[in-house]
UniProtKB/Swiss-Prot annotation:
Cofactor(s), by name: Mg(2+)
Record-linked InterPro entries: 4-PPantetheinyl_Trfase_dom (IPR008278), 4-PPantetheinyl_Trfase_dom_sf (IPR037143), ACPS (IPR002582), Ppantetheine-prot_Trfase_dom (IPR004568)
GO CC field: cytoplasm
Any Pfam family hit: ACPS
UniProt entry tagged with the keyword RNA-binding: no
NCBIfam families, per database record: acpS, pantethn_trn
GO biological process: fatty acid biosynthetic process
Protein name: Holo-[acyl-carrier-protein] synthase
Amino acid sequence: MIIGIGSDLIDITRIAKVIDRHGERFLDRIFTETEQARAGRRDKQPNLVAATYAKRFAAKEACSKALGTGIRQGVWWRDMGVVNQRGGRPTMLLTGGARARLDALTPPGMTAQIDLSITDEWPLAQAFVVISAIPAATSGT
């Protein structure tokens, strides 16, 4: 059963400009340490760094929409992090207010599953999030 869907499209150059202007202050406010480490491994190619951050920014926006709150009502940027499963498939790891909202949306006896798709084609990055409730006994995440 689908309990939330969200999508977001962002201009990668917008994220690059914000990073240039605000640097670590912006990165620390929006991105988890795991996300920053992943982008840091691409530091030899500035366009890849910006695209990496833009995809994760779009994923957070899409996730907040799937949660039905946007970035408010106790759901903050760093409560949502893009992590990779074995094999590289991205998903969202929720903490704090985002986790509380997810738990509130998930019906009793069910487990939430978050499916994430992220992509980029310069100068755009895009993310889709689908949150499903699946029977607890068959949950994969």
